[in-house]
Amino acid sequence: EISLKHLMSQSSGLMPHAYTNLVEDNMSYDRIVKRLNRVDFICAPGECYGYQNVVFSLVGDVVAANTGVDYEGFVTRKTFEPLNMARASFGRAAFLDDPKHARPHIWTGSHWRETRTTDHYYRIPPAAGVNASIEDMTQWLLAQLGHEPVVLSSDMLSEMHSPVIRTTLRQAHYKRRRGLGNTAYGLGWRLFDYGEDAGFVHHGGYVKGMRSEMMFNPRLQTGMVFLTNSEPSQMNNLVFDFLDLYREFRQSSEPAIVLMNRYQKPASQQVTPVGR
């Protein structure tokens, strides 16, 4: 039997990315859910990792069934409002209504071109339906670091940030890197150790023309959020480049700006298209 914990830890046992193709085809969430009984199990629930979008979004149905409030309303009231995430919202309409929204861009082979924002992933809010500014994400980062205990208690954070199911580097979408180990998935978060430090928490996001990365370490009280309305390939190295710079900063007596300049690449290397 699949539990809420299985859903949140991507360990339902179902075939990975079940019906993500139907999300891409713009099929409604309700229609997709009715087909989930056709999806095969690759292991018993809790026994293996398999990333999901549609299956993860069943969390929203659980919230609605237990609170009488839809997922969007529940998160707005319990998270966005108390954390003062003033521009955070759900849905394509809210995104387009924000006068300062960033338009997505894709690489054509010679230049970046603006592309259309679609409804596809907005149909599964728990997995991919949130809009937020960098200021909003800063508040979310601080809450994850334990600075908003009324909203996210220490016990809640500890449970979210603890390993539930082990993952391989490939499953975690990490390249081999010296010092990287103990990759796992908690409740909605990827987890890893790096170098001498344990307990890093991470997740990235991608929809056409947009990328995001958020990583932090509660024990070290450090973290980063990066949002871009494009698809630069350097995003794949961003988290670990940041950690290398952070480690050097901790060990060095040089000013931070000197270290940062050392990490900058020539302009021709800074932005290249993401391969498909």
Predicted stretch roles:
Residues E1-N53, G60, V69, R77, ...:
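Active-site-proximal loop and beta-strand segments within enzyme catalytic domains
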Residues L4-K5, A86, R219-T222:
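Loop/turn elements at helix/coil->beta-strand transitions in domains of secreted/extracellular proteins
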Residues S12-P16, D40-F41, N84-A88, P149, ...:
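Generic structural signal for secondary-structure transition and capping sites
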Residues Y19-T20, M27, A64-R77, E81, ...:
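Catalytic loop of the DD-peptidase/beta-lactamase superfamily, centered on the K-T-G motif
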Residues K34-N37, S89, H105, S154, ...:
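Juxtamembrane helix-loop transition sites at the ends of transmembrane segments
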Residues F41, Y49, A88, L187, ...:
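A broad, low-specificity signal marking well-ordered, structured residues that form hydrophobic/aromatic
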Residues F56, W107, F216-P218:
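Aromatic/pi-system hotspot detector in well-structured domains
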